[in-house]
């Protein structure tokens, strides 16, 4: 896969991302020679962020707002290279894809695992949920699978109705276009008939002159 456009503006950063960046810079100043354990460092940042007051977080939120404004300004003048495919527009009103049985299972047990093991990373929580799902008996999975099947059925009906919304207009335009075409054809035929009648009249006049 080819790399993205190097001239494209860098994506905007969140307030938490600015906070982590500051933490990393502080850590480098204090322990310039020490190697960083990413998982441990990430957990420490997360815990510190949770204990911070709204006033303390405000500084980073202001930085994020300024970065967002800067990013949006740059994106207005950014011209993507030729051949780059644009992202497909997502309609916010379009029906959302239904969750799978496994996703419903994760939604139910995720808070429980986080409560029992608050220090676990996102990756470890996902791994644990996967193991739990694999060890769950088929009978115990059935309620979730039935619920997922119902949601899928509803989604298919909703998406069909959503996609059909634009069709009546298109069909209407098609009818109007056909009617215009028919009318034009009739007008052309009428003009041809008039021309034929004129030619016949001229011929009759010529015959009268000959007599």
From Swiss-Prot:
Q: Which SUPFAM superfamilies match?
A: HMG-box
Does the keyword field hold Acetylation?
A: yes
Region labeled Disordered — which residues? 71-96, 161-211
Location of N6-acetyllysine modifications: 3, 7-8, 12, 28-30, 127-128, 172-173, 177, 180, 182-185
List where Acidic residues composition bias occurs: 187-211
Q: Which PROSITE patterns match?
A: HMG_BOX_2
User: Tell me, which GO biological process terms does this entry list?
Assistant: regulation of transcription by RNA polymerase II
One GO molecular-function entry: DNA binding, bending
Give the family, as the similarity comment puts it: Belongs to the HMGB family.
Q: What is this protein called?
A: High mobility group protein B1-like 1
């Amino acid at each position: 896969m080819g790399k993205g456009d190097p001239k494209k503006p860098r994506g905007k950063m969140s307030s938490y991302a600015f906070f982590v960046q500051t933490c990393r810079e502080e850590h480098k100043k204090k322990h310039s020679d020490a190697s960083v354990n990413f998982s441990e460092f990430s957990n420490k940042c997360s815990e510190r962020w949770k204990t911070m007051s709204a006033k303390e977080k405000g500084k980073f939120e202001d930085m994020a707002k300024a970065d967002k404004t800067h990013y949006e300004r740059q994106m207005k003048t950014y011209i993507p290279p030729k051949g780059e495919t644009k992202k497909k527009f997502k309609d916010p009103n379009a029906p959302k894809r239904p969750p799978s049985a496994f996703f419903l299972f994760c939604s139910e047990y995720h808070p429980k695992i986080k409560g029992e093991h608050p220090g676990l990373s996102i990756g470890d929580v996902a791994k644990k949920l996967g193991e739990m799902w694999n060890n769950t008996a088929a009978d115990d999975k059935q309620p979730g699978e039935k619920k997922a099947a119902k949601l899928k059925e509803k989604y298919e009906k909703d998406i069909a109705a959503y996609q059909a919304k634009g069709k009546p207009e298109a069909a209407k335009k098609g009818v109007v276009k056909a009617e215009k075409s028919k009318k034009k054809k009739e007008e052309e035929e009428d003009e041809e008939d008039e021309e034929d009648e004129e030619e016949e009249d001229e011929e009759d006049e010529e015959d009268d002159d000959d007599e």
